[in-house]
Design a protein with these regions (language model features):
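Alpha-helical transmembrane segments of integral membrane proteins
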Residues: 12-25, 112-119, 165-169
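Hydrophobic alpha-helical transmembrane segments of polytopic membrane proteins
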Residues: 153-171
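Membrane-interfacial hairpin junctions
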Residues: 3, 137-139, 145-150
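Predominantly long cytosolic amphipathic alpha-helical stalk/bundle segments
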Residues: 38-124, 128-142, 172-200
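Hydrophobic membrane-targeting segments
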Residues: 1-44
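Residue-level signature of catalytic and energy-coupling elements of molecular machines
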Residues: 9, 23, 60, 75, ...
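Hydrophobic alpha-helical transmembrane segments of integral membrane proteins
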Residues: 15, 111-119, 144, 148-155, ...
């Protein structure tokens, strides 16, 4: 660990934990939310090319049966409930879609907490450092200006670290949440398109 880490006080340890947790979530979500893992390009093309009747339905059904993407899961749900009335099928698929959205958003709440709590932890570290500095001044006097400056520097390390953890976490949270929204909208479009063609 660099020397400045230990100079920042006890708040640096929870900030280190926040940074590790935040980075792990960001990397995992970026990997999991790749478009190819959520929406298979082949399945997209099959749905777009699917006629109102004929073997196009069977091609989509056959491909989705072995497709491990999230869209494939939704499409299988549509076909699994195809014997139902359209509104019943829609309700069943919507219930599954809510579970899928929850999976896509996994970890984002924790990432939001990291972004919100890190500056507060930094501020706590700074406040505790300033209290320690004032206690030292009250007991030993002002001393050398360099000593006072060093004490203030050490107190501010925690705030700087808290912001350094919070800002990337906040940006990543906003980006990942927006990515989930766009992927969900796209999957909704393909699902609605399939439902419309199945129930013509």
């Amino acid at each position: 660990m660099p020397q400045w880490f230990f100079q920042g006080g006890v708040a640096m340890y929870p900030l280190l934990l926040c940074s590790v947790v935040g980075l792990a979530i960001i990397l995992e979500r970026i990997w999991s939310l790749r478009r190819s893992r959520v929406i298979a390009p082949t399945l997209e093309k099959l749905i777009d090319a699917m006629p109102a009747s004929g073997d196009g339905h069977e091609k989509v059904k056959a491909f989705s049966g072995g497709d491990r993407t999230v869209l494939g899961e939704l499409i299988r749900a549509v076909f699994n409930h195809a014997a139902m009335a359209k509104h019943e099928n829609v309700e069943a698929v919507q219930a599954i879609a809510r579970q899928i959205v929850g999976r896509l958003e996994r970890g984002l709440t924790t990432l939001s907490i990291v972004a919100e709590i890190s500056p507060l932890l930094g501020l706590l570290g700074t406040c505790s450092g300033m209290v320690k500095l004032f206690v030292d001044v009250s007991q030993h006097g002002l001393g050398e200006p360099a000593q006072i400056s060093r004490g203030i520097f050490e107190a501010l390390i925690a705030t700087v670290t808290g912001l350094a953890v919070a800002i990337p976490a906040l940006v990543a949270h906003m980006y990942l949440r927006r990515r989930v929204e766009l992927l969900v909208l796209e999957m909704e479009r393909y699902t609605n398109e399939l439902l419309a063609r199945l129930y013509r």
